[in-house]
Amino acid sequence: MTGFSFVADTNFLIAVHEGKEYVESFLDGAVIVSVISEIELLGWHKLKAEEKRLLRLLLDDCIIFELTADIRKLAIEIRQQVNIKTPDAIIAATSKYLQIPLVTSDNDFKIIPGIELILI
């Protein structure tokens, strides 16, 4: 891989799935995905079988990072510091734990201290 590693927020993965050009430059690196994003992507109740198949193929090209005790602790710290949803705190904690950027189009992450954020 010639690119850099980063944690992909769920909306980044949706943009990849939809073929958005502005995310293509990121796809040369290692795409790390929190298990939370996997659940958010595949857990939508209106997801059709073909979409689910395509999303699974997309996720197969990513590294799924599980929720560890250290990430749980970081997510709790983040939630104690700022008002953010628990899934977003876990995704941010994954980025912080791995010490790699979080790529997202969600401005809510801007309030979280201690993470490197790349807004797309």
Task: Pin down the residues of each PLM region.
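Short, well-structured N-terminal submotif of metal-dependent ribonuclease cores
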Residues: M1-V33, G43-R56
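Histidine- and aromatic-rich ligand-binding microenvironments
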Residues: A8-D9, V33-S34, I84-K85, D106, ...
